[in-house]
């Protein structure tokens, strides 16, 4: 939940400005106000939201405000741990599109931690698959998604739902074959 990382007693402006103040980039929230407003607009939130409190924002809005705070110090690497898991699918898609656009515009690298393979397929250039705390496969995203080598990765990808019923039936048969090989 992106809201859990915000201080509920502070406005969105104060929350977004906090890393800027801690790292002495600005002397006060008032000094950082224009930059915070720019950050909010960058993540598609109106400047007026600076005066709101976290509980006044929807989940998607809190996620975008959290992204603004994460980008405040202009990082070269952003670590995003399950950033869309608490959001409904339509909001997820908007946040992911925003994320892709900002990554292209600003040029930061991202370590995106997720269990959602549709998100991985949409965002990743490179993939690392973990099973029981161990890395079992890593490489180019297209290679891993289209031609996985590790048995766990194969089962993981075979378990994904497919919109086409005929293709889904083939997908399930392949998953059952993989599971039978394991037995």
Regions found by a protein language model. Name each.
Residues 120-122:
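A short, surface-exposed alpha-helical micro-motif characterized by mixed small hydrophobic
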Residues 72-76:
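A short, proline-enriched helix->beta-strand linker immediately N-terminal to the Walker B motif
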Residues 53-57, 61:
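Conserved ABC ATPase signature
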Residues 16, 67, 95:
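Hydrophobic anchor residue at the start of the ABC signature
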Residues 30-48, 157-158:
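Conserved ABC ATPase "signature" region
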């Amino acid at each position: 939940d992106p809201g859990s990382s915000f201080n509920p007693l502070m406005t969105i402006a104060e929350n977004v400005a906090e890393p800027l103040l801690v790292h002495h980039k600005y002397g006060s929230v008032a000094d950082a106000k224009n930059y915070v407003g720019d950050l909010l607009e960058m993540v598609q939130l109106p400047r007026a939201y600076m005066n709101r409190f976290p509980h006044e924002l929807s989940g998607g809005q809190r996620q975008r405000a959290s992204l603004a705070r994460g980008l405040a110090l202009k990082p070269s690497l952003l670590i995003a741990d399950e950033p869309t898991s608490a959001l409904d699918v339509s909001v997820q898609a908007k946040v992911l599109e925003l994320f892709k656009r900002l990554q292209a515009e600003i040029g930061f690298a991202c370590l995106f931690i997720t269990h959602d393979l549709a998100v991985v397929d949409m965002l990743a250039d490179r993939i690392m698959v973990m099973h029981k705390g161990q890395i079992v496969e890593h490489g180019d995203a297209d290679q891993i998604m289209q031609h996985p080598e590790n048995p766990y990765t194969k089962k993981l990808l075979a378990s994904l739902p497919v919109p086409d019923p005929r293709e889904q039936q083939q997908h399930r048969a392949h998953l059952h074959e993989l599971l039978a090989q394991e037995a």
